[in-house]
Amino acid sequence: LGYDAKSGDFLWKFNVIPQPGEYGHETWENDSWQYTGDISSWAPISADQELGQVFIPTNGVTIDYYGGHHPGDNLYGTSLISLDARTGERAWHFQMVHHDIWNFDTPTAPILLDTEAGPIVAQATKQGYVYVFNRETGEPIWPIEEVAMPASTVPGEQLSATQPIPTKPAAFEYTGSSEELLVDFTPELKRQALQAVAEFQMGPLFNPPMRANDPSGKQAALMCPSGAVNITHPPVADPESGVMYIMSRYSCSSRRLVSGEEADTYYDEPTGVTLSRFAAASGGPSPRHPAGLPLWKPPYSRITAIDLNTGEHLWMKPAGYTPDRVKNLPELSGIEIGNTGSGAVGQMVATGNMLIYSNVSSDGTP
């Protein structure tokens, strides 16, 4: 919604779920636009005063982890939208997740910079990628490719066959889950990690949730990085150098679906009746390393510096210090593991020659 800042008068409304006749309406199949919602912008909005454009990052569609009731790509869910601030007209948009069921809400404000690549807007995402566009035209600064992704085995779910992945910058965090990412400080710790994940479905970044009692025998699908926690604090950038700094952490969640009616029974006081055929089960199995280690290789949290003039990574450093609970494990006695990072994320400030950040020490204090 747009209002006159001086008078408070209402100026315009932009429908984030396109109505009949509006651009993107066809991405809501089976008339699902009529009863689906929750597309909003919980991250801050950015603006270019000279262009008169506002840049709005959006979240996904109701509900997380199952989308059989809203087939289609579902514009403008999990997108970056550029609107004319005076009229509310769409200048351009880019959808970063088609038919988002992974809780990959766009979590931070878009960053505006003038670089050697031109006037850009850079959007960091939970997926571990930064999407970079010319902020006037919406053209990607570097190619973004539609990459094939696995289909869902859950009845009624129709995932997009592809998802848009930037060719540059490279991912700033691990994406997906695989044996190669499991902790391997010693062969025995790696063996234990493999055993811990044996009953879970590993896979790429857009690994689909699976239903309980799946015919594969797996307990749940691993979603890595988890859509809830990996990047919730805003990146910062130095406008002089064009360098962006992102603090992130890698963690996974396990997702299994049950029937909508069964999902309601997990809550003592449900707010209503679930109409979805499937919904995420509350609680449920999650893999744990028997030694008390994180299952995945460090760094547990990191800061990545990306040159947005070139799209290249400049450096990566662990954020914080190795937790005492990791350093003091008997299984690691006499083994040099280096600084793993704390596993916590915090705030950052960039100056002309310094990057200042908050995190926690090895004993968990700020």
Where are the regions a protein language model picked out?
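Beta-sheet-rich non-transmembrane sensory/scaffold domains
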Residues: 1-366
